[in-house]
From Swiss-Prot:
Name of the protein in its database record: Copine-1
Claim: Glycoprotein is one of the keywords in the record: no
Gene: Cpne1
Major site of localization recorded for this protein: nucleus
Oligomer and partners: Homodimer; homodimerizes via its C2 domains. Interacts with p65/RELA (via N-terminus); this interaction induces proteolytic cleavage of p65/RELA subunit and inhibition of NF-kappa-B transcriptional activity. Interacts (via VWFA domain) with ACTB, CCDC22, MYCBP2, PPP5C, RDX and UBE2O.
Swiss-Prot/TrEMBL GO biological process terms: neuron projection extension; positive regulation of neuron differentiation; positive regulation of phosphatidylinositol 3-kinase/protein kinase B signal transduction
Family per record: Belongs to the copine family.
PROSITE patterns: C2
Residue span, C2 domain: 1-113, 122-244
Residues bearing PTM N6-acetyllysine: K170
Amino acid sequence: MAHCVTLVQLSVSCEHLIDKDIGSKSDPLCVLLQDVGGAWAELCRTERVRNCSSPEFSKTLQIEYHFETVQKLRFGIYDIDNKTPELGDDDFLGGAECSLGQIVSSQTLTLPLMLKPGKPAGRGTITVSAQELKDSRVVTMEVEARNLDKKDFLGKSDPFLEFFRQGDGKWQLAYRTEVVKNNLNPTWKRFSVSLQHFCGGDLSTPIQVRCSDYDSDGSHDLIGTFHTTLAQLQAVPAEFECVHPEKQQRKKNYRNSGTVRVKTCRVETEYSFLDYVMGGCQINFTVGVDFTGSNGDPSSPDSLHYLSPTGVNEYLTALWSVGSVVQDYDSDKLFPAFGFGAQVPPDWQVSHEFALNFNPSNPYCAGIQGIVDAYRQALPQVRLYGPTNFAPIINHVARFAAQAAQQRSASQYFVLLLLTDGAVTDVEATCKAVVDASKLPMSVIIVGVGGADFEVMEQLDADGGPLRTRSGEAAARDIVQFVPYRRFQNAPRETLAQTVLAEVPTQMVSYFRAQGWAPLKAPPTPGKGPAQAPQA
């Protein structure tokens, strides 16, 4: 079993950001990046806060904390003026670098924002506080309001809610809803937020709810406020009067500025990757190796399949890197391994899913070393040919994943590792295979070996939006992760694995959550403690 790490939640706020927008304040967003083998990789980002030079971000940033590793982090603040996810066309308001260890040991760390080394971003600062996520429970709530005060001269109010928890003698933002335009009787979208972040895990923690009218210049008008606790919010249908303190003092017959009604409020367990793995889910690992002619003659030192005097090449290095991590999650350590794009004996027909051990009824290899041995033995026995077709192997693994899904339990998940030297040939068939597989307990990892153009692979990765078939059917979720091997060839071997496997836990959990499947063995529920409602 791999080492279990602690999940840390980072809350971010900034002060005195420089203004890049003419006539208004910036619309800041915070991006968190981590140093991965000398390259900065984005982990997550907060929401955008409109027209604010001292934002307190509602969305937290979550990261796994490894005591044994120096985890270098970079926080980037950007002024977002468009809807594209890319940041290259947005103004950079400043950044700061530190390690996660620094934040954890300080609990709250304030750093000056820098435009570049030696050049401060005005008086801008960033404050990051860390909180260990010990509780996997989430608060799920659905809220509406009725008869809110009209705040806009030419229209109705544009209301939104903010929930603040009391802590360290001040009110800390826990959640902010979306804005409902021009509506005095709004219903906000259902939302979920971690119990720890919402109320520190304590159902009796004072909660302040503020209802405000959104203004594009950032000068939001207070409609009303009320105080409560999560325990009271759970007593649905719960109704609270929104009171404007100044109106209450000025007007003798003032009653309220509207009411907020909690339609649903539940505390639910949000299972993690470790919950599923430790609950008994097996991760089934399958390997597919590219034996197309573009790799070059294996006997030539220029070939990607050429085995060096030490018996390795890029294919084997990538296989070891990823396989050595994944094999810890498979109890029998028997892995099916296939080749594709080669002419195979005895009839020398081109095959796109031949067993590396030439035993189609039992293609399993004992451990990663077994795959390596089968690869080395197969190499001189096949003729490299083509084309580069992925669909047959993806569909092969998908058939097993479909059988597992029929059990309707979180018992198995499938990871297919494809090692290839070039662009896929059967693009349409592969897109359809991936879209079909996205409905199954399965992920696909593609490692590009060599220096070819891998643009088509980036399309399969679909980071810019859901992958679609030619007929327009969209993938149910993103299940493909592609990386070119040579980006990591000078980095420690574990760096490649960390990158290509980074999305698998999220992909696995998203599938099981969508199906509504709990871990086979549910984790113990928290006992009596701060997260329990007060006793009468």
